Amino acid sequence: MKKIITILMLILSTLSFAAKKLYVGTNAEFKPYEYLENNKMVGFDIELMELLGKELGYEIKWQDMSFDGLLPALQMKKIDTVIAGMSATPEREKAVSFSIPYVFFEGGHDVIVNDKSSFKKKEDLKGKTIGVQLGSIQEQFAKDNGSIPKLYNNFTEALLDLQNQKIDAVIIAEVSGKEYLKTMKGIKKIDTIKDKLPNASIAFRKTDAKLAKEFSDTILKLKNSPEYAKLVKKYFPEHYDNFIASLKKNK
């Protein structure tokens, strides 16, 4: 009888462990948040989620998909949560819930053009075609600028079209734009758009309030840790001092 009870306990323990798998959706085309390197997903979000998962006892199972498909996949329960450098905009909050922000520094959005163009500032692009990622906040920035947004599955496609002068500009998050400007020829930055949107957060189904709170509480716990500061310094070195100042301000 004792053997049977022991076996049952082992089975239950195994099932309990299996239930701790957390399927996380991301879009690995947004360096330095998440991107592919030697066919492996790396980046700030990837390491942070693994750190959060370790703290909470979850085994993270990654699902890479298109950015505009992330929230629908979450709502359809194909994944459990989303981390993808995503801001908790009012429009998105109608569909899903968010953790507290996990990035604590101000950012902007680069306006990038072909280096042969004569555009000098964002106002020069009124009525012009601007490439943006489908489902991103940059689409609204283009509209607010009086420009015509052209939607792409990812920013790489948009920037390739910009190189070939098929569009007039691309608007992309500053931290990601910086990476493309290092490696892609024939493009240049002419302006920056600042916004008052919240920093990046993790998305959850509205019915998963307990899970969202778990992650929010753990973000609060980790944000002052050496591990967190190390990640910021690794992936956002230019924002490190700003990050430390922001932490002191928000204590």
Predicted regions and their residues:
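Extracytoplasmic small-molecule ligand-binding "clamshell" domains
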Residues: A19-M86
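Beta->alpha turn/N-cap motifs
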Residues: G25-F30, Q63-D68, K77-T89, D115, ...
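Periplasmic-binding protein-like
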Residues: A28, F104-V113, K178-L220, E238-K251
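Extended ligand-binding regions for polar small-molecule ligands
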Residues: I46-E55, K116-F119, E123-D124, T129, ...
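A conserved helix-loop-strand patch within extracytoplasmic ligand-binding domains
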Residues: Y58, S87-A88, I100-I148
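Alpha-to-beta junction loops
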Residues: Y58-E59, Q75-A84, K128, Q163-S176, ...
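Short helix-initiation/N-cap motifs at beta->coil->alpha
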Residues: K61-L74, L134-G135, K150-N164, K196-P198
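A ligand-binding cleft/hinge motif common to bilobed small-molecule-binding domains
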Residues: P72, M86-A95, F141, D168-K196
